[in-house]
């Protein structure tokens, strides 16, 4: 479907500026003429809109006639909707909180912070059943220190 400039920006504003004034996901679908299943939209609205934004950022809208820009915006919304109409938001993981909890990715290594004061304190090394141990002052944990008694 093709749109003329007057369809989207009767006051002369470009399509992206016009879209920024919309707030509800349904408004985007209605404005761009994209049909949708309310059940899919209710389940994945934020994911669809975020993905549409990702697709729009990848497009170059500079110097495009409004009708052409509107057609591209419509295609971005249709593509984003299709992504979530056929699979769950967990599959696409568009939000950082879901991306960080992706079970298919290796967990980030845990970084342990040891304050300088901890390093400068004298250590408490003792022989515990033939194994040298050291007590951590900060966490009060006992850790093996096999080379400490040599």
Swiss-Prot record:
GO biological process: nitrogen fixation
Keywords annotated in UniProt: Nitrogen fixation, Plasmid
Keyword Metal-binding: no
InterPro entries cross-referenced by the UniProt entry: NifW
Taxonomic superkingdom: Bacteria
Database matches in Pfam families: NifW
Subunit structure: Homotrimer; associates with NifD.
Family the UniProt entry places it in: Belongs to the NifW family.
Function: May protect the nitrogenase Fe-Mo protein from oxidative damage.
Protein name: Nitrogenase-stabilizing/protective protein NifW
